């Protein structure tokens, strides 16, 4: 196994610089993009900044954050910028740059071409999945995974241990780096890391668990347990994660949804096996991806877009290796001959992708939820509680106590969800208001029973198409 060790930090290549410029411009244009789940992080941070504690609802110590590292990194920028939404967006954007650059340096370990090593960055900068996940921890997670691969192949075990610990704090699934790398070490020509290399990652993860227990009175975040419970109940159906993965990949490099582009990229990715120097990387990354995907698929976890970010990042690295392998074997060696092709690709992507990307993502994702949240803030008492299924946008704009029907930020609800019981939460946490979809979603089935018992009164002044608002058990109607 040989690596290219002549990596020039001063000359990263025009493709990488161009990709970073595209990412910077797009992120600036899409800065107002608000992902519903990102606003959950933002509300935790805003409450912390306002002195209400690191909580979703003031006075309720429930841990609904599955990425503690992302939350911690967002605190200072949120405080400086004065708005938690800007804090999470800034960290997410900076991590997107870090992810692109990290994968560039990973590929430079195996190939000599600056331009081809930067191809994953260009694909990332032109793909909608990068911007759909802005405000979430996805880019931080992919950056730490890439950095872990880099440190592994550079045999920097001590730094690798720290990086894996941080990856686990970015998303718990980072733990799958451990068995993947252990198998590579066991069956490959590598020495095991010294004991000291395990100390800091153990301390990092252990400290977070201790904090969870002392602050929230629970070792694990309620949001993670809630999603496990949703999977156990069969809420999302069988094979939902895998089917959604296949559906998402049809987008390939554009937002047009072209299957032909996807299959072309897939063939290029398969050709990555031509690059002998990268085969250990292919085995390691694919092993990690197999563990990661199996976890979500076997537990029937919800198919959230940010869960697939690592699939795209690794896929793009395989595509770049495939292009390099084909050029080395059949065409030419070096950067100069591919520059014209990459320029055409970049310009084509900008003209085809950018207008559609900006038109579809250039505004808040859930404008209806935003308007509902504002209405609740103006037409309900400040101490009122509202039960809803999707809590992020409505919770942020309503500034009301939120009861989460699916249990992400409301304690003890997830155990009912695991049993397929979407009604008992109502007895445990009776709200002042319940907002539901019209027609009802399955998760809102409790409304039917309570309505028959005469415990609900519809709020006539709430006139949002596709939604209804009820007062519960004689609570004061909306003003």
What is each of the regions a protein language model found here?
Residues 345-395, 401-439, 455-479:
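Membrane-embedded, lumen/periplasm-facing catalytic core of multi-pass transferases
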Residues 64, 68-71, 85-102, 118-144, ...:
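Aromatic- and kink-enriched transmembrane "portal" helix at the membrane-lumen/periplasm boundary
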Residues 17-22, 164, 198-208, 276-298, ...:
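Transmembrane alpha-helix segments characteristic
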Residues 167-170, 176, 258-261, 284, ...:
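Hydrophobic/aromatic-rich transmembrane helices and adjacent perimembrane loops
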Residues 100-104, 182-186, 250-293, 319-325:
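Hydrophobic, aromatic-rich transmembrane alpha-helices
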Residues 43-44, 50-66, 213-272, 297-298, ...:
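Membrane-lumen/periplasm interface segments of multi-pass, membrane-embedded glycan/lipid transferases
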Residues 102-105, 122-123, 140-160, 182, ...:
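Specific aromatic-rich, kink-prone transmembrane helix
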Residues 11-17, 86-87, 98-127, 142-143, ...:
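Transmembrane-helix signature of polytopic, membrane-embedded enzymes
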